[in-house]
Amino acid sequence: MKTMTQMRKPHVLLHSTKTMQAVAPRLQTDTSIDGGPYVQRGSTQNFVVSYEGSLGADGQTFADAVLAVCEQDYTFLQSVFGNISIQGLPFQVYLRLGDSNNGGAYHYSCDATALYCFITPGEPTELASMLVVAEEDEVFMANQNVGWNCGYSNGEGLSRVLATELHPSALNGFASAASWLDSNRPDWVDNTEQTDTDYVSIGCATLFLNYLRYQLGMNWSNIVQAGGDTLAQTYSNLTGASDAFSPFATLLQSRFPQGTPSGLQNDNPFPIG
């Protein structure tokens, strides 16, 4: 009798103009390290940070930038996720050499604490920290287990807004809101798309989460701890109301009329009005 071989698809933070040609699904049993050889630059209580030797001095610079803030960022995530315990620590951060075909970050399961971040020399050093947070917070989601799925649009949206909250200047190339505003604006609030690579559904998610935070005035801790299988469920958990999408879409229509290019270069146009 043949045994089905199970594969793990990487969960990714995809750059808007780059692919990940160097990344592919792997066997469930494969625990090897992608890329390398690596140079370990340093460690903290919850992180070990290494860079590909091919990055040279740039690798040291980016690794040092991560080491300088990673514990501070971890403390923020611990707070908003309700001080839950995280399994599999420390995080192993691997900074890989990026190029025009490889950008963003990934890990091989939502709870995987080996985090890979593509870095291209010349990019802002804060980018590395933003990428780490975007993958790290997905591990928090998996350990929390209240509905945020790192491979679905709701979890990918949360991943991005929390990373941007901590590192707003590093969003360039990862902003997704305009992709939804400039589309036919499907309802990815009442529905969740089962992918983390569609910029339209991700854009809807980042907009809605920022709407909760910066239009309705809810704090990140309450939002994160009110997770559900859809963003509408999160809204209902927070407010007791069921009409999540319509007021949100109507408000955005007032600022960004559908059919007209939005021109929005970040994920947070709020507050509006």
Q: Predicted segment positions?
A:
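Beta/coil-rich, acidic/histidine-enriched accessory regions frequently appended to metallopeptidases
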Residues: 24, 229-273
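Zn2+-dependent metallopeptidase catalytic core
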Residues: 1-136, 140-150
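Structured segments of extracytoplasmic/periplasmic soluble domains
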Residues: 69-84, 139-143, 162-165, 169, ...
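Secretory-pathway/luminal and periplasmic proteins that interact with or process carbohydrate-rich
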Residues: 100-104, 166-172, 232-234
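Short, solvent-exposed aromatic-acidic interface loops
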Residues: 97-99, 225-231
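Solvent-exposed loop and beta-edge segments used for protein-protein assembly and interaction
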Residues: 43, 201-203
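Post-HExxH zinc-binding segment in Zn-dependent metallohydrolases
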Residues: 73, 149-199, 210, 217
